[in-house]
């Protein structure tokens, strides 16, 4: 039985809804690449069927206000890419984000296909499927959060599921919880009953937002939901929904009471020990994350003023951020201040695509709201009952999504849901008064045989097929294959199969051809693997030289690329282990790095290490002090200063800096150094740091009984009964001579005689 094209498109759309489940550890950036690749394959197959339907007259391309704004936005981001700082990166993006013009165009194409083929009933079927899919998705996320493992995704400290990021999960469930609310209201309209099964899904999916601890998601969902209930309470169009009005008023009052109670108890153990409530009550512009986002938005605005019309180009926020970096971000978030996104979607759009990009982006929301407001006005018309409620929910979805995006950026799951919802809204607005159609192919009057229409149809099909085939092979499948090969190369490096790794690397570069975005992913991926998994040796010289050469080629296009320059310096440092002349090259590269990012602590830390290796101790000290002026919590800088004073035979200052290095988590490589620093900390009774040090020592020498004895005593000093007993017993297991002392120690612990525990 031959399936109609529309039916096939419907099932392909459902297949798109399952792409958020796709995670593969065999690709570089496992939570990103497979989802984006499969979605693009599905959309391009859908596009071919769609063109076939148009040619056969089974559907028409309808243009209303919303679809026109999307076309304008698609054009603006292309112009911005051409005028930006790196067209390749703007157009194709990389493995880490898989967005760019090419990625966004796929979502816009997805919108046009579903908006022109499906009617409202089709969309309702898709939405129902999506709500149940998301409910299952949330269930699996909870299993993973509880310690389970599903596929390659294992337990995470926060609820994130297959997204890999709690914030991504939050926005996904903003859409789905409110879609469930849409079906709840539809059922309510029919039954007039407050409770129906959809309410359970609304509550369940809303709770997942709060369990994830995503504050932007909480705010987005909260304001979207608030918009619905206040509209039901105060809007004249809601006057016939008396029961909903009462329920909304009750919900509003209950919500105010709940928030008031939670915030008044924010300093109590009840709130502090509940992760979701603690995250909720920590919402503040003074919170480090909030302050960092605000500073990044200021940087985005400063960058916009440099390129006000079409911006720096999509995906090119990183160079803008580096050039206009605000050092205050380091003080606020010392461990996470390097942004390749503004973490504020509107401001990022402004910086990367300029004022024209931002206006066209905002017009998408304006057009969608205009359609929904027009839909509300149909409430009193025959066969239009309930339109006010339904439009209200979709307005809330757009509000929640937009608010959440003020705190983050878009990604696969958010784009998928956004353009799916836009497709539905577009169909709601498809009336003769609000839309126009692309004319069908002309038909002759039958008196003469006109082959032009048929030839035109055939030509359109051939061109479409060729374009889609080329796009799939070169722009979709090839990047996926290269992503997999990056991981294969990294695995070879971890096995110390260096010859095979080098051959795989060269083969991957050859496959990438002239696509700079792919070459950059390959080079950065392998350089990061060198930093994390490879012990430098002279037989790696050809590999390292090749990496440096490729890095130099990429830097001709992106001289501002901090990561490339940093990696180059690290590789040169590796080579200096067998070629002392390379240390000077590393120094020059590090000095170039200072010009790119003078306010980055890592920049000066690298220089401090290089100067120390060159035995230029005064310069090393100067750079280490610069690091601490930028980030007073940098453990390595304290360690370098400790080495400096130790070299100067100034033991008092050396010990002071070594102790600070320990407090901020420096990983010492020498067991004796750890013991000496721990002894210094005993005088200050800093048992928390002592415990961290002795745990490091166990990793260095797991058979040293004395370390277990000291660790047991340290845990005893902080009244951690369970761990004190555990390590005392371990000491006795390793050396039976400690058995009696261990039993005496445990007796002290059991009796609560903490003061008698020796240091």
Predicted stretch roles:
Residues 477-494, 506-536, 557-578, 599-609, ...:
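Amphipathic alpha-helical repeat scaffolds of TPR domains
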Residues 1-99, 109, 113-132, 183-199, ...:
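Transmembrane signal-anchor hairpin modules in multi-pass inner-membrane enzymes, especially those
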Residues 165, 285, 292-339, 346, ...:
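TM-adjacent membrane-interface loops and short helices in multi-pass inner/ER membrane proteins
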Residues 145-148, 207-212, 217, 221, ...:
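A membrane-periplasm/extracellular boundary helix in multi-pass inner-membrane enzymes
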Residues 42-48, 220-229, 361-364, 371, ...:
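Transmembrane alpha-helices of multi-pass inner-membrane enzymes
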Residues 74-84, 122-153, 164, 168, ...:
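Hydrophobic alpha-helical transmembrane segments
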Residues 12-17, 21, 134, 197-203, ...:
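Loop-to-helix entry and N-terminal half of a specific, functionally important transmembrane alpha helix
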């Amino acid at each position: 039985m031959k399936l109609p094209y529309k039916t096939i498109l419907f099932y392909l759309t459902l297949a798109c809804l399952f792409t958020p489940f796709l995670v593969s550890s065999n690709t570089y950036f496992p939570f990103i690449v497979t989802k984006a690749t499969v979605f693009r394959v599905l959309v391009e197959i859908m596009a071919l069927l769609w063109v076939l339907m148009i040619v056969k007259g089974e559907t028409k391309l309808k243009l209303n206000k919303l679809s026109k704004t999307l076309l304008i936005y698609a054009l603006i981001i292309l112009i911005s890419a051409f005028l930006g700082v790196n067209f390749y990166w703007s157009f194709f993006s990389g493995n880490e984000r898989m967005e760019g013009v090419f990625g966004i165009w796929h979502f816009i194409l997805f919108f046009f296909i579903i908006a022109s083929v499906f009617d409202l009933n089709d969309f309702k079927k898709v939405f129902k499927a999506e709500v149940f899919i998301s409910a299952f998705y949330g269930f699996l996320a909870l299993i993973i959060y509880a310690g389970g493992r599903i596929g390659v995704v294992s337990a995470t400290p926060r609820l994130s599921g297959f997204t890999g990021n709690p914030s991504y999960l939050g926005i996904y469930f903003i859409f789905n919880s409110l879609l469930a609310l849409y079906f709840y209201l539809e059922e309510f309209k029919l039954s007039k009953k407050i409770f129906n099964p959809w309410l359970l899904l609304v509550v369940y999916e809303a709770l997942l937002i709060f369990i994830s601890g995503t504050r932007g998601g909480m705010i987005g969902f909260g304001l979207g939901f608030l918009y619905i209930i206040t509209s039901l309470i105060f809007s004249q169009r809601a006057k016939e929904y008396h029961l909903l009005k009462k329920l909304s008023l009750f919900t509003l009052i209950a919500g105010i009471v709940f928030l008031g109670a939670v915030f008044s108890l924010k300093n109590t153990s009840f709130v502090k020990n509940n992760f979701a409530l603690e995250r909720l009550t920590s919402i503040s512009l003074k919170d480090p994350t909030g302050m960092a986002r605000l500073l990044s938005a200021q940087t985005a605005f400063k960058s916009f003023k440099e390129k006000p019309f079409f911006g720096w180009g999509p995906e090119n926020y990183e160079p803008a951020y580096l050039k206009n970096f605000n050092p205050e971000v380091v003080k606020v978030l010392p461990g996470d201040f390097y942004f390749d996104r503004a973490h504020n979607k509107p401001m990022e759009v402004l910086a990367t695509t300029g004022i024209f990009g931002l206006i066209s982006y905002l017009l998408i929301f304006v057009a969608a709201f205009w359609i929904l407001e027009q839909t509300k006005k149909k409430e009193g018309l025959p066969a239009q009952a309930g339109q006010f409620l339904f439009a209200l929910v979709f307005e809330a979805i757009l509000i929640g999504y937009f608010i959440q995006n003020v705190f983050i950026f878009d990604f696969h799951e958010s784009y998928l849901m956004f353009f799916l919802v836009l497709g539905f809204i577009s169909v709601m607005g498809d009336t003769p008064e609000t839309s126009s159609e692309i004319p069908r192919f002309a038909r002759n009057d039958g008196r003469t045989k006109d082959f032009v229409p048929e030839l035109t149809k055939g030509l359109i099909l051939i061109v479409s097929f060729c374009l889609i085939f080329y796009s799939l092979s070169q722009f979709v499948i090839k990047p996926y294959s290269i992503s997999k090969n990056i991981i294969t190369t990294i695995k070879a490096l971890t096995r110390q199969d260096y010859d095979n790794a080098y051959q795989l690397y060269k083969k991957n570069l050859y496959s990438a051809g002239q696509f700079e975005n792919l070459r950059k992913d390959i080079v950065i991926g392998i350089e990061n693997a060198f930093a994390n998994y490879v012990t430098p040796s002279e037989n790696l010289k050809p590999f390292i030289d090749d990496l440096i050469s490729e890095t130099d080629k990429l830097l001709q296009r992106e001289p501002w690329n901090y990561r490339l320059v940093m990696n180059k310096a690290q590789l040169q440092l590796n080579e200096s282990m067998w070629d002392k002349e390379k240390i000077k090259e590393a120094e020059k590269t590090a000095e170039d790095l200072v010009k790119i990012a003078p306010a980055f602590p890592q920049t000066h830390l690298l220089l401090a290490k290089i100067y120390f290796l060159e035995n230029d101790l005064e310069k090393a000290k100067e750079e280490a002090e610069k690091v601490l002026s930028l980030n007073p919590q940098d453990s390595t800088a304290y360690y370098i200063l400790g080495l400096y004073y130790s070299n100067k035979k100034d033991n008092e200052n050396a010990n002071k800096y070594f102790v600070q290095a320990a407090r901020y988590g420096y990983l010492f490589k020498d067991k004796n150094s750890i013991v000496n620093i721990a002894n210094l900390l005993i005088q200050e009774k800093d048992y928390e740091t002592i415990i961290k040090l002795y745990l490091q020592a166990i990793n260095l020498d797991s058979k040293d009984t004395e370390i277990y004895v000291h660790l047991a005593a340290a845990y005893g000093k902080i009244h951690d009964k369970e761990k004190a007993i555990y390590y005392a017993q371990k000491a006795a297991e390793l050396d039976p001579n400690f058995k009696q002392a261990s039993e005496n120690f445990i007796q002290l612990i059991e009796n609560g005689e903490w003061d008698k525990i020796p240091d």
